[in-house]
Design a protein with these regions (language model features):
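GST-like domain detector, emphasizing the conserved glutathione-binding G-site
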Residues: 1-141
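GST-like fold's C-terminal all-alpha helical module
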Residues: 114, 118-201
Length: 201
């Protein structure tokens, strides 16, 4: 297998989840290697393992053993957005991004916004798939206007994309955009944050 995706626990690592969802959804063959996150200090097992591989000290990262990086090493692609773009270029026969130029630009815009924005939702609704966090979600929703603004912006963006594409996914067919917002769906679900009927589907 030439592609190796190194991830943290996808129950807690939203960025790992995004990359994993994308590769699985398009049936792209890869080995998935879990690095247990036991902390982020320099002496943690996580940092030690990641730094030994030569990445940036974060997950996910993708190694393509079929490509050299110019230093006689396998190519390492760090950061989820870079991984998405690398996969889109490498597997151009897969519709990683929408075919329509305008829709593709809008999808990239939203991925970039997700990449750098929605800080309140990330901060107060930590990624945690499984437990019922509805009581915590109710308090977060009550006490943090910034979270409410983030969710409102997400709902507006989703509604706009669905109106333009006709669904069933955000840009019509499944794309990187859906993989990017998959962890947001998990946060909305497990924290039971109020959303409209359209967002619930």
């Amino acid at each position: 297998m030439t592609l190796k995706l190194y991830i943290g626990n996808k129950n807690y690592s939203s960025w790992s989840m995004r990359a994993g969802v994308l590769l699985r959804a398009f049936g792209i063959a890869h080995d998935e290697i879990l690095i247990r996150i036991d902390g982020f200090d320099a002496n943690s097992t996580f940092k030690t393992e990641v730094n030994q591989i030569g990445a940036t000290g974060t997950v996910p990262f993708l190694i393509d053993t079929s490509v050299q990086d110019g230093h006689d090493q396998s190519l390492i692609i760090t950061d989820t957005l870079s991984i998405v773009e690398y996969i889109a270029e490498t597997f151009a026969d897969h519709p990683i991004w929408p075919k329509d130029r305008a829709m593709r630009a809008k999808a990239r815009n939203l991925c970039a916004e997700m990449h750098s924005g929605f800080g309140a939702l990330r901060q107060h609704c930590m990624m945690n798939i499984g437990p019922d966090l509805s009581r915590a979600g109710a308090l977060i929703w009550r006490d943090h206007a910034a979270v409410r603004r983030d969710v409102a912006r997400i709902e507006t963006a989703w509604a706009d994309m669905l109106a333009l594409s006709g669904g069933p996914y955000l840009a019509g067919d499944f794309s990187a955009l859906d993989a990017y917002f998959a962890p947001v769906v998990m946060r909305l679900k497990y924290y039971s944050l109020p959303v409209t009927g359209e967002s619930q589907t």
